[in-house]
Regions:
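Substrate-binding/gating loop at the entrance of the active-site cleft, primarily
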Residues: 99-113, 117-141, 149-150
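N-terminal Rossmann-like NAD(P)+-binding subdomain of aldehyde/semialdehyde dehydrogenases
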Residues: 1-106, 133
């Protein structure tokens, strides 16, 4: 397990160091939308498997309800990705500039954090929102949800 985490972390660091333009980010997000649309039926099939597993493990009904996907929820996920893709690029934005009495110019600039770790309950929209927001802001994400409910999240 630790070797796997080490590899994930190394890959995330490499990905973080490869800066891409906002235009390319939006192109990738549009491709992400196309992949979700193309694989919508497969995602729903995998989600059904996850629901069966959740029920067999006697998870609470409210968790199962949040886990469940349908065409409307997938449309909502796609809409969220489109909305995020329209955000201005937050990377390298000058937030504040000032000059010290000695003439030194200082600038506060927004930059990516790097690698963000997220642990959450299995919710398909969270998987998509977190990955999309991190990607748009130039960050990498390592996310962990309920391990026995991952088939559809891998697809998303």
């Amino acid at each position: 397990m630790s070797k796997n985490l080490e590899k994930i972390g190394t890959n995330a660091k490499i990905a973080f160091q490869n800066k891409i333009s906002n235009k390319k980010k939006n192109k990738v997000l549009n491709y992400y939308i196309q992949l979700i649309k193309k694989n919508q039926n497969k995602i729903l099939v995998e989600n059904t498997k996850d629901i069966k597993i959740a029920k067999s493990k006697k998870l609470k009904e409210n968790l199962i309800k949040r886990l469940a996907l349908n065409n409307d929820k997938i449309s909502s996920i796609i809409k969220s990705i489109k909305t995020i893709s329209k955000f201005k690029d937050p990377v390298d934005v000058d937030i504040e500039t000032w000059k010290r009495p000695n003439g030194l110019k200082l600038k506060k600039v927004s930059i990516p954090i790097g690698i963000i770790g997220v642990i959450y309950e299995s919710r398909p929209n969270v998987t998509s929102d977190v990955s999309t927001l991190c990607f748009k802001s130039g960050n990498c994400v390592i996310s962990v949800s309920y391990t026995h409910l991952r088939a559809h999240e891998t697809m998303v």
